[in-house]
């Protein structure tokens, strides 16, 4: 892997605000990952698109205050900054509605993302949500195509129904070197790809290695930690259980925290096994405070 750029990580995808009845929080998995990495001291870039509106201004203000580069941020003169409407039932359980036709659906490639051309960060991170629209999907896949072989391509599958299909999943798996999914997403991948004939998880993982040539697969399991699958050790996973603190306040953003710490430790030269343990511990600590980004304000 060759690094010939001033930054270590590129994340490309959505910026959204979670809009609650009485408050709002900035988010989107790509932004959350870059936020954490920037606070860890890793030079990072986010490629996304926001609206020319109040939420867009809030995003710029927060990013500047946290030292997050705005080099890859585009502003759309017509489409609004991404929003997720959050509805709470009588018990306070949230229901999320991701609004359609948002600025992040229209991320443009060259010349807007010229800083990517000829540069090879250590890691390039992406997911599936921002690929729901053909404009952003084309930009994401073309960008990853330029980086493939020089940067580690990290797919955090982040399935958000109904915003994915067979083509998006298959193309994304073909592009990635590293896959991260949770248990529910793994079952959904099995269904979407028509792999129901595989009786067990290990056989399914083995199929991903052979079909997509993925180098490492991380399956997160909530309070039970995470498993690391490696092709040379397949089909048996390397298990990393964890004991979460009894002081859990909020699990929102735990997956993004895991990913951020995992990438951070891999950049530091840690083995995937050690990086996984440290990532689990970091995610569990994030769950002890409210919000996906504890120091957002």
Feature locations, PLM:
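Glycine-rich phosphate/adenosyl-contacting loop at the front of the ribokinase-like
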Residues: 1-69, 73
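Conserved phosphate-binding/catalytic region of the ribokinase-like
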Residues: 1-7, 198-297
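Active-site metal-binding loops of divalent metal-dependent hydrolases
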Residues: 14-15, 129, 157, 257
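Conserved N-terminal subdomain of the carbohydrate kinase-like
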Residues: 43-128
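Hydrophobic anchor at the start of a short beta-strand
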Residues: 44, 70, 151-153, 217
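Structural alpha-helical scaffold elements that stabilize or flank donor/cofactor-binding regions
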Residues: 116-117, 171-172, 210
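Conserved beta-alpha-beta core of the PfkB/ribokinase-like small-molecule kinase fold
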Residues: 123, 128-203, 225-226, 231
């Amino acid at each position: 892997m060759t690094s010939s750029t001033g930054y270590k990580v590129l994340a490309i995808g959505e910026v959204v605000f979670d809009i609650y009845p009485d408050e709002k929080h900035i988010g989107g998995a790509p932004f959350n990952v870059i936020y954490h990495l920037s606070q860890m001291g890793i030079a990072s870039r986010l490629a996304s698109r926001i609206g020319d509106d109040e939420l867009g201004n809030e995003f710029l203000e927060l990013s500047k205050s946290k030292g997050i580069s705005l080099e890859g941020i585009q502003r759309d003169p017509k489409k609004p900054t991404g929003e997720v409407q959050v509805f709470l039932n009588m018990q306070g359980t949230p229901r999320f509605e991701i609004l359609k036709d948002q600025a992040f659906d229209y991320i443009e490639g060259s010349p807007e993302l010229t800083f990517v051309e000829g540069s090879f960060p250590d890691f390039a991170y992406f997911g599936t949500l921002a690929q729901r629209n053909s404009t952003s999907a084309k930009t994401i896949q073309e960008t990853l195509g330029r980086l493939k072989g020089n940067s580690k391509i990290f797919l955090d599958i982040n399935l958000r129904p109904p915003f994915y299909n067979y083509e998006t999943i298959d193309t994304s798996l073909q592009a990635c070197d590293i896959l991260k999914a949770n248990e529910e997403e793994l079952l959904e991948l099995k269904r979407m790809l028509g792999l129901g004939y595989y009786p067990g998880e290990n056989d399914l993982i083995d199929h991903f290695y052979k079909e997509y040539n993925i180098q490492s697969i991380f399956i997160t399991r909530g309070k039970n930690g995470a498993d690391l699958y490696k092709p040379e050790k397949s089909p048996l996973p390397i298990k990393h259980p964890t004991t979460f603190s009894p002081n859990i306040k909020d699990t929102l953003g735990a997956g993004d925290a895991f990913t951020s710490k995992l990438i951070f430790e891999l950049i530091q030269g840690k083995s995937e096994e050690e990086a996984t343990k440290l990532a689990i511990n970091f995610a569990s600590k994030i769950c002890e405070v409210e919000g996906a980004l504890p120091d957002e304000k």
